[in-house]
Amino acid sequence: MANVCAICGKGVASGIQVSHSHIRTKRTWKPNLQRVHAIVNGTPTRISVCTRCLRSGKVQRAV
């Protein structure tokens, strides 16, 4: 799936952006995903992972 972290499942969030003149428009917030080579079930695969999972060490990177 696009725009979803393979580890924690973080995806796109939607909401309303409010300008200084209080004009409200719909917008989306996308997670900061990186395509990395990681070890999944003993085999190296390429997955999309958010940077929070990368920084916290939840991903075992393939060498």
UniProtKB/Swiss-Prot annotation:
The keyword Ribonucleoprotein applies. GO terms for molecular function: structural constituent of ribosome. InterPro entries: Bacterial_rp_bL28 (IPR050096), Ribosomal_bL28 (IPR026569), Ribosomal_bL28/bL31-like_sf (IPR034704), Ribosomal_bL28_bact-type (IPR001383), Ribosomal_bL28_sf (IPR037147). One of its GO terms (cellular component) is ribonucleoprotein complex. SUPFAM superfamilies: L28p-like. Transmembrane segments: none annotated. Keywords: Ribonucleoprotein, Ribosomal protein. One of its GO terms (biological process) is translation. It comes from the Bacteria. It holds the Pfam family Ribosomal_L28. The keyword Ribonucleoprotein applies. HAMAP family: Ribosomal_bL28 (MF_00373). PANTHER family: 50S RIBOSOMAL PROTEIN L28 (PTHR39080), LARGE RIBOSOMAL SUBUNIT PROTEIN BL28A (PTHR39080:SF1). Belongs to the bacterial ribosomal protein bL28 family. This is Large ribosomal subunit protein bL28. The gene is rpmB.
